[in-house]
């Protein structure tokens, strides 16, 4: 087996997961116990987030910076694809059952802005 074949095979074994990078966090001085947090989520081609819940206090604004994101919250009839420059809102405690790159060939990037209690995690993965 050639070196390039081995490298390609090892790439296929790597899990395609998103990467969330905090960009900003600041306590809201006029709203006691709340903070504003922004996170950029990078999705390689074909990457998916594990199902998760958002904090019970978190109001979320999501904006697609590039590519296309497929998203579905519990109770929605089907997943929706959001393209670059499109956005949506998520209510506190939302259960994200689908959150993934809609493309297997292009990367996607999402900006998520949270208003959340200062003592809460932004997301909690579903129990397996």
Functional labels for PLM-detected ranges:
Residues 3-12:
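Hydrophobic helical h-region of N-terminal Sec-dependent signal peptides
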Residues 11-19:
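Sec/Tat signal peptide C-region and signal peptidase I cleavage site
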Residues 20-51, 57:
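A short glycine-rich, His/Asp/Glu-containing loop-to-beta-strand
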Residues 28-33, 43-45, 73-93:
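Short acidic-glycine-tyrosine-enriched beta hairpin
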Residues 33-38, 56-59, 77, 93, ...:
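Extracytoplasmic
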Residues 49-55, 73, 80-81, 99-102:
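Short histidine-centered beta-strand/loop micro-motifs
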Residues 57-76, 84-86:
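Glycine- and acidic-residue-biased ligand/ion/polar-headgroup-sensing regions
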Residues 70, 78, 94-121:
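Ligand-binding loop in jelly-roll beta-barrel domains
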């Amino acid at each position: 087996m050639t070196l390039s074949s081995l490298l390609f095979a090892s790439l296929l074994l790597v899990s395609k997961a998103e990467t969330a990078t905090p960009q900003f966090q600041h306590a809201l001085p006029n709203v006691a116990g709340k903070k504003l947090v922004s996170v950029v989520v990078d999705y390689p081609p074909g990457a998916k987030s594990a199902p998760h819940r958002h904090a019970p206090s978190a109001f979320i604004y999501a904006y697609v910076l590039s590519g296309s994101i497929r998203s579905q919250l519990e109770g929605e009839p089907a997943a929706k694809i959001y393209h670059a420059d499109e956005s949506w809102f998520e209510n506190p405690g939302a259960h994200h059952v689908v959150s993934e790159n809609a493309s297997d060939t292009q990367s996607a990037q999402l900006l998520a802005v949270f208003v959340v209690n200062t003592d809460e995690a932004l997301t909690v993965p579903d129990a397996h």
